Amino acid sequence: MLNLPVPEAEYINEVLKPSETQQEMVSSFADRAERVRNGNVDPRTDNMLKITNDGRKLALDQRLINDLLPDEPESKVNLCVENAYQVWEESTPDKSTQLIFCDLSTPKADGTFNVYDDVREKLVAKGIPREEIAFIHEANTETKKAELFAKVRSGQVRILLGSTPKLGAGTNIRATCCRTNSNVG
């Protein structure tokens, strides 16, 4: 085992109130669970695993349940965007990088709503150059990963989004990392 120095972490737990839509949906999850427990629904149609998965999606962003629902200003995603933008501004002199972990709603090429694209578009709208925001999923070969990590270490990429399996292990960028946002999902 390597005895590398580990920086001391500051953990911040953000507590958000659910939107009215989220409260209604949680109530509907309880109704669904009751029907499942009572055997009133075919397990292929609905089951506790589906209900739990829908709950995880709802906790992240209600648009993951139905992309026609409104973008709630007080959502986890919007709080992450605000925090990421603030840290980006503060760390600009050092060109430090932030990691944003999101295990649900990874990037899709089919145009459906996903958190990764939503975060990137909102950060770009706030003024962060698009080329400073990357997804680990775009580096789908070892060569592309090495190129991406080099851009991170040089300060060309300042915000890197990824899932825990893809970004959590084997990522050698700690020399420039200033913040990790893992509360997104």
Task: Go through each PLM region and give its residues.
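Short glycine-/polar-rich loops that comprise or flank the Walker A/P-loop
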Residues: 9-11, 128-132, 157, 174-179
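Conserved strand-helix element at the start of the C-terminal RecA-like helicase core
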Residues: 40-48, 92-119
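Generic beta-sheet signal
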Residues: 12, 96-100, 157-162
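Phosphate/oxyanion-binding active-site loops and adjacent basic polyanion-contact surfaces
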Residues: 69-81, 111-116
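Inter-lobe coupling linker of SF2 helicases/translocases
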Residues: 1-70, 86
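Conserved helicase ATPase core of P-loop NTP-dependent helicases/translocases
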Residues: 120, 124, 129-167
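SF2 helicase motor core recognition
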Residues: 55, 146, 159-185
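Short, solvent-exposed loop/turn segments at secondary-structure junctions
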Residues: 21-23, 31, 57-65, 103-107, ...
